[in-house]
Amino acid sequence: MALKAIQRQEFNRDDILEFKNTLCLGERNDGLLKYFENEHTLKDSDYKMFVVAILKEENEDRLTILERIVATNENFSDKDLPKVQKISASLNRENAHAGEKIQSDEGVWSTK
């Protein structure tokens, strides 16, 4: 499952970058992505559905990979998933490009 998730992430990467660049996706503080309306999604319902579908896939893939990390690391148990998600969120914020939306650990949204 994790390999398929990584492959799908690679396939969707350009779309994710575009959506983050146009501010209809942002990096949440739990390692997942959040949807935001923008001018394009408000005017074009098909585009909005596409963004939401890709968002759903990306979040599923991220969770699959994080769950695999927890399952295969002897230092983690299932209850450590939220901690691993926070670590992932921190890395995602660090790797976000200037102008992208990011959420702090405290839940505050800002633009990097």
PLM segments and residue spans:
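Short, well-ordered alpha-helical segments
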Residues: 54-70
